[in-house]
Structure formats: C-alpha cells, structure tokens
C-alpha cells in the first residue's frame, strides 16, 4: 500500500515539476526573444500555456524543444522561419520550436484541437540538409520512422514530420 502511495506521489511531483519547467521555459523564451510581452501577447501566451497543459502536451513540447536544440547545437541548423504547423503558436515560438521574423506579424493563434487531430506536425528544413537532420535524429536515438515516405520523429502524443522546403 505504501509503495502505491509513494509511486503516485512521485508521479504527481514529476508532473508538477515538468509543468513548472515548461511554463518557465516558455515565459523565459518569449522575454529572451521579444522582451516583456504586451498585455495582448501575455494573454495569448498564458491562455495557450494553460490549454497545452490541460491537453497534457507539455512533455511532448519540451521533448520537441530538446530535439530542435539538439539539431541546432549538433549541426548549427534551425527550422525555416514562418513555415510548418507550429509557427502560429506563441508557445512553440517561445520554446524555439518555430521561428517568426517579426512578432508584430503574428497572425491568428494556433488551434491545438486542429493540431491534435492532425497528429503529425511539420517542421521544415532546407531541401539540401533535411536528410542530414533525419540522420542526426537517428544517431541521437530519437524514435524515427516514416509515414507515406516522409521521415517522422515520434514523441508521446505528437509526431514531427521533417519536411523539406523546395
């Protein structure tokens, strides 16, 4: 009985710790890239943060951030700005998963319901290096596969398709 309680407690603490780390990284990332958010962006960011946590996607997004950071540090490559399924997400932009040249051109925020229905989300790299990104992911033991001939990296609830911009 005590072991069950300990496991539940450990799981709850781990989840709380992950949520706090997620919130911190998102908020810090936004301020680091764009400065203190205006009240409008602050509301967008906090609303999106809360919804992502409600959907239980914080671990996946932190893992995707680690993946993108790993590609950046190992290969010096970043996703192509303003392309892909996540560039309308302030959270993804704040985490460095997606890029946008000018925050003032930020459009309609991402619908996470729509993204979850898709399940496979695209991140774009230039055509000539996309295969190197996929090989790097395999070397670093990310869970890779293909879907309709396109390379994907699998996370818990989301899959990332490594797309090429031609």
Where are the model-predicted features located?
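Alpha-helical scaffold/interaction cores of sigma-54-like transcription cofactors
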Residues: 1-166
């Amino acid at each position: 009985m005590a072991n069950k309680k300990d496991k539940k407690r450990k799981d709850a603490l781990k989840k709380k710790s992950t949520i706090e780390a997620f919130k911190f990284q998102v908020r810090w990332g936004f301020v680091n890239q764009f400065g203190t958010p205006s009240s409008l962006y602050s509301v967008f960011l906090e609303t999106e943060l809360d919804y992502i946590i409600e959907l239980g996607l914080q671990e996946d997004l932190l893992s995707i951030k680690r993946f993108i950071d790993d590609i950046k540090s190992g290969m010096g490559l970043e996703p192509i700005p303003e392309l892909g399924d996540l560039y309308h997400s302030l959270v993804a932009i704040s985490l460095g998963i997606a890029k946008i040249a000018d925050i003032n051109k930020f459009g309609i925020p991402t619908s996470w319901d729509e993204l979850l229905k898709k399940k496979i989300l695209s991140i774009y790299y230039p055509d000539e290096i996309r295969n190197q990104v996929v090989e790097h992911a395999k070397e670093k033991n990310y869970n890779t596969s293909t879907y309709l001939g396109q390379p994907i990296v699998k996370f818990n609830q989301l899959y990332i398709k490594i797309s090429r911009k031609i």
